[in-house]
Amino acid sequence: MKILVTGAKGFVGQNLVANLINIQQGKNRTRPALQIDEIYEYDITSTPQELETYCAQADFVFNLAGVNRPKDQSEFMQGNFGFASTLLDTLKKHGNTCPVMLASSIQATLIGRYGESDYGKSKLAGEELFFAYAKETGAQVLVYRFPNLFGKWCRPNYNSVIATFCNNIANDLPIQVNDASVELELLYIDDLVEEMLDALEGKAHRCNYDGLAAQAAADGRYCYALTTHKVILGEIVELLDLFK
């Protein structure tokens, strides 16, 4: 099997690629059904020709590329919708209808505090693009709406409140909390990677959404990781303070 990972140098991409390499090299034997021949790592420094080659040969695509902290709000749509369009167009060009996974966000629900999120709007546009692609080509698409992620190799002050809080407390920096009563849904990176490996084996967990909550459904439109943790923001700060 040849696997394309876009956004391979990002937080999720690094963790996924490391696990794929361990499986490929026989260091991780928990997935004996997976036979990995090639891992194509595509990121911002990769060339258009590399994308052409990878899209022509891939048996499965993890699309993790995206923009979280743009200099301008318009970059959300360009980075999250624009590249997704380029990726799918390139797959179509080569007649490759392999399964494609999309890393979306819970912000794509545009519910509550996410209602005016430009990031969420760009992710929702990417989702609709993928669903239209599936209808047009018959390819399987697996759309995951990630909640708040945390774990190793996560950058502070970027896309994880946990990484930011840990960094600030470790370095005696102040923590800013606007509303300590906010409930967060957290997903640990290793739990996410296990779900992504399930998807690679054809065992993705399907769901539909009732507001912000994933509801298991065998024929669900979306996919999700089973193990998440719901916590109050203020309680996270109190817990981390205990490590000082």
Language model: regions and residue ranges:
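SDR active-site strand-loop-helix element
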Residues: 6, 61-65, 100-106, 144-146
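Glycine-rich "substrate-gating" loop/helix at the edge of Rossmann-like oxidoreductase active sites
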Residues: 116, 147-157, 179-187, 222-229
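Substrate-positioning beta->alpha
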Residues: 156-164, 181-202, 234, 238
